[in-house]
Amino acid sequence: MAVFIEKETKILIQGFTGKMGTFHAEEMIKYGSNLVGGVTPGKGGQKHLDRPVFNTVKDAVKHTGATASILFVPPAFAADSAMEAADAGIKTCVAIVDGIPSHDMIRIKRYMRRYSRTEKMTLVGPNCAGIISPGKSMLGIMPGHIYKEGRVGIISRSGTLGYEAAEQMKNLGIGISTSVGIGGDPINGSSFRDIIEKFETDDETDAILMIGEIGGPQEVAAGEFAKENMKKPIIGYIAGLTAPKGRVMGHAGAIVSAYGESAVEKVELLKECGVTISKNPSVMGETVKQVLSKK
């Protein structure tokens, strides 16, 4: 069973009738995702892309049985939308939205504490590419045609580096079980550690490619967890080897501020944890191939 989404997974779009919601809904439908409807307050009862529109996520879940959603709403409304999804029983929610205030992300994470581990919604993002299980379903904004179905899991803070890895692997005949873009913000819904733990128990995943960058302790925390708890091999790439300290590089979370947050330091610490490191982005696929050949 794939991580997070299957071909049958029923999906909602929050912000369904807006420009971005409409565009990516069409792309997801073309890919084969089971999009059963969407939510736009005030437009309940209408049809959009031949699918029902609801005023609330609760109504949408009640009438469609949806278990996954994706947010295409303005940053100011993203926190309330995510919490509404959790309260409605959504199991997996992807927040594509860029620019969500850090205080709002803290509010979401605090709100989610009211749920038990088994009831808690998985939030992926914000500022991310989303999730794709090639050949099954897409809950995101990635170009689906570059993904080949296979048995390597990808986790990436950067959307475009995730795409690059997928394309390289496809050209080498290596497929992907699930690819998850966790986003480049300092505070996100799911961490590297959260996702590699799921891949470890996934019977469709044999190895994991983890694509990180400067800033924050997430990559090293995942490596330390893997060293003590995982058997599946992990390949890593850390972007930002030449990035100076104290300067934001692209993503809001990509800033080196403490020991263990630079690319060089992360690479050394991950090597100590048994992670195989790709030296540069152009050989991510080749590095995965080398690791798989040793299994």
Predicted regions located by residue number:
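Catalytic-core regions of core metabolic enzymes
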Residues: 1-295
